[in-house]
Amino acid sequence: MPEGPEIRRAADNLEAAIKGKPLTDVWFAFAQLKPYESQLTGQIVTRIETRGKALLTHFSNGLTLYSHNQLYGVWRVIDTGEIPQTTRILRVRLQTADKTILLYSASDIEMLTADQLTTHPFLQRVGPDVLDARLTPEEVKARLLSPRFRNRQFSGLLLDQAFLAGLGNYLRVEILWQVGLTGQHKAKDLNEAQLNALSHALLDIPRLSYTTRGQADENKHHGALFRFKVFHRDGEACERCGGIIEKTTLSSRPFYWCPHCQK
């Protein structure tokens, strides 16, 4: 499943296609969204926000389209008038004079008012997004030490969107390798230096992955600057200590680590 950096880049592509342009046609597959087609035609997409793995498409009339791709949903950008060759089921079409964005296969789609944005169940549960430039290491450290999270093992905590939105499995293993910790640790047991290192890595690594335009694939690379240190590298030598990277399962997900330098 895509993680925060991949979802933010997808949102960037959608924004580049239609942001600031009047919508010439709007279509929704679900009956409960049909009344909004006429309300949105002629409006402008002002921005597309990511909240973890959810996208919020904000319109100039104050409405917001909430969508969560879950496992199968995917957005596409096409030239207006193009007919895509796909077997996927179309859910949303937002069309401008020159570009159209399409959402396929997703089922978690809603239209929200400004008030509903503050009470939506998923948006209430999800933590601050690691790609939100306003989020600081000091705030992350405070969350780590909060009563809600301080006694949670990192193996599960770093997959929990309520802690920090946008993290996922490859980020989990890369962050823990960066700070030299195993997944069994808890924030309450770390010393000050470890807490500070982890608080920075929880933001630095997702942001580096995003800015270097990498993607999680078998090439193990995230652009020119971000390269997987342990993810999908079991059996290889750790570049930090020379130990052999191992693979196990933690919190029902594959976990890669170096037993020689992660303690």
Curated annotation (Swiss-Prot):
Necessary cofactors: Zn(2+)
Cofactor note: Binds 1 zinc ion per subunit.
Residues binding DNA, per UniProt: 70, 125, 169
Cited InterPro entries: DNA_glyclase/AP_lyase_DNA-bd, DNA_glyclase_Znf_dom_DNA_BS, EcNei-like_N, Endonuclease-VIII, FPG_cat, MutM-like_N-ter, Ribosomal_uS13-like_H2TH, Znf_DNA_glyclase/AP_lyase
SMART domains: Fapy_DNA_glyco, H2TH
GO biological process, one term: base-excision repair
GO molecular function ontology, one term from the record: oxidized pyrimidine nucleobase lesion DNA N-glycosylase activity
Active site: 2 (schiff-base intermediate with dna), 3 (proton donor), 53 (proton donor), 253 (proton donor)
Family membership noted in the UniProt record: Belongs to the FPG family.
Function: Involved in base excision repair of DNA damaged by oxidation or by mutagenic agents. Acts as a DNA glycosylase that recognizes and removes damaged bases. Has a preference for oxidized pyrimidines, such as thymine glycol, 5,6-dihydrouracil and 5,6-dihydrothymine. Has AP (apurinic/apyrimidinic) lyase activity and introduces nicks in the DNA strand. Cleaves the DNA backbone by beta-delta elimination to generate a single-strand break at the site of the removed base with both 3'- and 5'-phosphates.
HAMAP family: Endonuclease_8
UniProt name for this protein: Endonuclease 8
Species of the source: Salmonella schwarzengrund (strain CVM19633)
